[in-house]
Amino acid sequence: MRIIPRTMSTQHPDNAKVPEWAKSEVIEGEDEVKEAFLAYSMYGVHEVMWDAEGKDVDTHVVRKLLSNYPDYFREHILGKDVFLTYRLPNPKVEGADRKVFAETMESIPITYDLAEKFYGNGITVPVFEVILPMTTSNLEIISVARYYEKAVANEDELELYDGVKVKDLVGEIYPKVIEVIPLVEDRDSLQNIDNIVEGYYKVIKPKYMRVFLARSDPAMNYGMITAVLSVKIALSELYKLSESLNFEIYPIIGVGSLPFRGHLSPENYEKVLEEYKGVYTYTIQSAFKYDYDYDKVKSAISSINNSRIGPAKILEKYEEDVLRKITILYTERYQPIIENLANAINDVSVLLPRRRARKLHIGLFGYSRSAGKVSLPRAISFVGSLYSIGIPPELIGISSLSNLDEKEWDIFKQNYVNFKHDLQTAARFFNWESFELIKDIWKISEDTIAKIKEDIDYAESVIGIKLGGIDYDSRKHILMSSLFLLSFKEKILQESKKYLYEMALIRRSLG
């Protein structure tokens, strides 16, 4: 049996600090190849996700890794000891990137040939897994697996002319199959994940399956509590399915440093391991790696790698029904507020520092993320914008919990163990001055302000959260938030950008 990675380094652009080895503030090109090597060698991460989604991808990454760092990769075999996993664009969703999907798939046999030359015949398959984002049905992942088998691996048998086959020209094509990891990002698909996985299992018959649960995008689209509870439902469903099919399923969770995006940081990883029992692989995003002291980061990654994997909490039907009800109530409260803050979020997001060469951050084309009726930036910019205007998104929608009875509240607390801790961590950055300033700058309605105030009041009076600065860093952040809003109002944008960067350094994450 292969090693199932415990940690997966990603290229999420959530870091405030720029690593010393980067040639510029935007990490791209050769720097991303170097970053992959450093993730393995310096940080001890088991797996690197190589992202072809929403950006220009370098499909020669394996060639560059093996030729630039031969000593390391002779000792640590790519595909056996450490892993490289492609994240594809979803051709159903990202129409402009359909051919990037094809190009990335076509590059997999090239990596096989390179590894054969480097390691010897039959030693390893360096890239054998791909991640499909925004998966909503089993048909999508079945199509990806079959596309590779039929359109890539089997093309070596095509006859070109007069008995001459493709393999006579370019050699035989390996590997013959690839493993597809669905990345599930929307609420309904997370809560019905068993249908996606079981459908794939019945057709493809894999020996095991890795399933990637998003935690960041569902938080942006439906609210933090909806995201957490949807992941808990998904983990329970996957473990039930694993037992009923007698088939191993290894969940991955996509988590960032701030509470809204998962709260996996070098300072909070133990609580996240406790929160998401049953998860095999945790994403190590850029803020985790670059916004904390290196020794602390390396130690945290080592601890995650060596931690025990506990079984997921299996939910009874009545518990699952309660959690589903909470996610609906929460989303109904959360989304209208976000829709009314969308102009503010979009205006601030374009001023945040850029850390990766990502295409199309906003708009209906390509990479817009939509919550209800409006277009929003990507999740990192979304979170960074709300923190920067002094309204951490973790607080939005909280008062919907007032609709729960005592039994429902108990079920909620049992299934979101670190709820109060996550909320308190975020609430330190709440700025009371924001209301007047955002009303003035973006003409935010009295009704929206009143709803946020209800959420704030509920967090304070019912949950017992202390809002606002309680230490030097949080007080400084609140001050910077007011200065940012004032400079933005006066259109002194260079100063606005400076304050945004300073706040990100304090949070140890852009968003």
Curated annotation (Swiss-Prot):
Q: What class of enzyme is it?
A: lyase
Tell me the function of this protein. Catalyzes the irreversible beta-carboxylation of phosphoenolpyruvate (PEP) to form oxaloacetate (OAA), a four-carbon dicarboxylic acid source for the tricarboxylic acid cycle.
Which cofactors does it use? Mg(2+)
The domain of life is Archaea
Recorded family membership = Belongs to the PEPCase type 2 family.
E.C. number(s) listed in UniProt? 4.1.1.31
Q: What is this protein called?
A: Phosphoenolpyruvate carboxylase
The biological processes this protein is annotated with in GO are: carbon fixation; oxaloacetate metabolic process; tricarboxylic acid cycle
Which reactions does this protein catalyse? oxaloacetate + phosphate = phosphoenolpyruvate + hydrogencarbonate
Listed InterPro entries: PEP_COase_arc-type, Pyrv/PenolPyrv_kinase-like_dom
Q: What is the lineage of its organism?
A: Archaea, Thermoproteota, Thermoprotei, Sulfolobales, Sulfolobaceae
A GO molecular function annotation here is: magnesium ion binding
The answer to keyword Iron-sulfur applying to this record is: no
The subunit field of the Swiss-Prot or TrEMBL record says: Homotetramer.
Concerning Pfam families, the annotation shows: PEPcase_2
Q: Which UniProt keywords apply?
A: Carbon dioxide fixation, Lyase, Magnesium
